[in-house]
């Protein structure tokens, strides 16, 4: 074990200590020892599989495509509404034609070339409103149907029999966390009937998993960016998401220890579930729930769930527009400060927003054991800090430039590996807006509490992404793990 591997190992416990410093209740009797020990064991187990057992790579790749058919089904409905231009078939690019600039012999570099003589093809790309939001509507209706037939109630009860006695996690928490391995905020829809009765600790854990992991759709976009420099990236991104769930659980439980008894601490009988609203009725408007307590037919349940999914999508859009608008204003204000006369303008050119974010994330980046080289360490810290405002896409693109030699080549193999893991989660302000918007729509009766908990969950999600990076840093190069082979480089 090298010195950097040791730093990564110590960093895991350092992150737990930071979470404890911000805990709502630092009484030792409420410290979640079982969850911490089991959560770390699961992370180290997944890390050992992906770094030391190449056979596991194919299994993880298969897992990442498990929900492909579900998302294709959602796309089929969206394609009928919005058309093939905005919702193309799987594996196809959609584009529109623009005339070639007069006098130019070729198309711009960001186009796909001359599709027909004299016309350039411009990719439409992934449009959030036409691709992500229809998935929310479809899954909301589908999950409501599953609750109507009793599938998720059965799964929750089965999980509860093992999870709560063993590790003090409720069945609803486990169900929501497991869903995060495959989807994003849609995982909260999976446990929607339980949200109103969840304890603060449970709700924080569910929200934290949304921030500390990434959906299958996001992983696909990350793979398309990183594969040229990291050919074997897909199983590692899937592993990062799988490790992110236990990391979020243990960190959120340290931040907000469980001091109450969860509703799903024990199996819930069908009669008690119906009386408590744990059914497809949870996917209808709360006023209708009081007026019409009778059970819905399967068709009614699915349609009501889809209608509620539309409300969730609208709430997500509103929150996202607000948050990204505020971020834009912040960037604009700081850029204006750089135009002030010297020496103030010069000072703000140095104390820029990326540098401030880099300073903020530097201690956590050090904990991952990413490098002993100051330049590599600092630039890695800036990239991770930028994720807070820019999402992971632009930092990943910067990594590609840093590895391929476009500009200054500064990313080594170890830094590439750890950055890939650390940046993979949804721990950024854009997704904070998505989670807040969805959570308020899912459980409007706890609106004030949800907004407060989202900040705690956001912190847990951020720390979880660093913890996943620490796990990757610990396994890099030890026990015979060949970093070149792990990356898939020839």
PLM region spans:
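Intrinsically disordered, low-complexity non-transmembrane regions of multi-pass membrane transporters
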Residues: 1, 66, 77-113, 258-309, ...
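Hydrophobic transmembrane alpha-helices of multi-pass small-molecule transporters
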Residues: 1-66, 72, 280-282, 288-321, ...
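Hydrophobic core segments of alpha-helical transmembrane domains in multi-pass membrane transport
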Residues: 11-22, 39-51, 136-144, 216, ...
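Juxtamembrane and boundary regions of transmembrane helices in multi-pass small-molecule transporters
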Residues: 27, 196, 221-288, 436-443, ...
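Interfacial/capping segments of alpha-helical transmembrane domains
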Residues: 49-93, 154, 330-363, 376-383, ...
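Hydrophobic alpha-helical hairpins/lids featuring a short glycine-rich hinge
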Residues: 72-161
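Alpha-helical membrane segments and immediately flanking helix-loop junctions
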Residues: 164-227, 380-471
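Transmembrane helical segments that form the transport core of multi-pass membrane transport proteins
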Residues: 307-407
């Amino acid at each position: 074990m090298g010195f950097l591997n040791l730093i990564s190992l110590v960093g895991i416990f350092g992150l737990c200590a930071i979470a404890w410093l911000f805990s709502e209740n630092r009484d030792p009797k409420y410290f979640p020892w079982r969850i911490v020990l089991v959560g770390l064991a699961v992370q180290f187990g997944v890390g050992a599989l992906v770094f030391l057992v190449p056979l596991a790579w194919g299994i993880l790749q298969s897992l990442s495509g498990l929900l492909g058919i579900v998302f294709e089904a959602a796309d089929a409905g969206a394609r009928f509404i919005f058309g093939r231009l905005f919702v193309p078939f799987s594996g196809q690019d959609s584009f529109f034609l623009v005339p070639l600039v007069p006098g130019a012999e070729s198309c711009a570099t960001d186009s796909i070339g001359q599709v027909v003589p004299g016309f350039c093809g411009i990719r439409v790309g992934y449009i959030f409103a036409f691709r992500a939001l229809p998935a929310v509507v479809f899954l909301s209706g589908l999950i409501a149907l599953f609750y109507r037939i009793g599938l998720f109630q059965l799964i929750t009860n089965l999980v509860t029999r093992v999870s709560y006695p063993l590790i003090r996690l409720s069945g609803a928490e486990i169900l929501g966390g497991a869903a995060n391995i495959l989807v994003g905020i849609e995982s909260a829809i999976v446990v929607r009937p339980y949200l109103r009765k969840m304890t603060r600790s449970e709700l924080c854990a569910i929200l934290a998993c949304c921030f500390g992991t990434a959906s299958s759709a996001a992983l696909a976009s990350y793979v398309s960016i990183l594969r040229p420099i990291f050919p074997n990236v897909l199983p590692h991104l899937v592993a990062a998401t799988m490790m992110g769930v236990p990391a979020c659980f243990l960190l959120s439980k340290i931040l907000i220890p469980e001091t109450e008894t969860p509703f799903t601490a024990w199996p819930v009988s069908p009669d008690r579930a119906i009386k408590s609203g744990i059914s497809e009725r949870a996917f209808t408007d709360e006023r209708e729930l009081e007026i019409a307590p009778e059970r819905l037919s399967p068709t009614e349940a699915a349609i009501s769930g889809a209608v509620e999914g539309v409300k969730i999508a609208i709430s997500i859009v509103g929150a996202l527009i607000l948050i990204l608008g505020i971020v834009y204003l912040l960037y604009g204000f700081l850029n204006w400060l750089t135009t002030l006369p010297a020496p103030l303008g010069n000072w703000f050119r140095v104390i820029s927003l990326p540098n401030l974010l880099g300073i903020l994330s530097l201690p956590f980046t050090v904990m991952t054991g990413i490098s002993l080289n100051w330049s590599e360490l600092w630039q890695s810290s800036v990239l991770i800090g930028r994720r807070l405002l820019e999402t992971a896409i632009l930092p990943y693109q910067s990594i590609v430039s840093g590895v391929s030699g476009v500009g200054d080549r500064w990313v080594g193999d170890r830094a590439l590996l750890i950055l890939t893991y650390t940046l993979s989660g949804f721990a950024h302000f854009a997704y904070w807006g998505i989670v807040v918007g969805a959570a308020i729509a899912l459980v409007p009766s706890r609106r004030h509490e949800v907004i407060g908990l989202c900040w705690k969950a956001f912190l847990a999600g951020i720390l979880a992404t660093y913890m996943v990076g620490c796990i990757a840093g610990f396994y890099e190069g030890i026990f015979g793990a060949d970093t070149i082979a792990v990356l898939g480089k020839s």
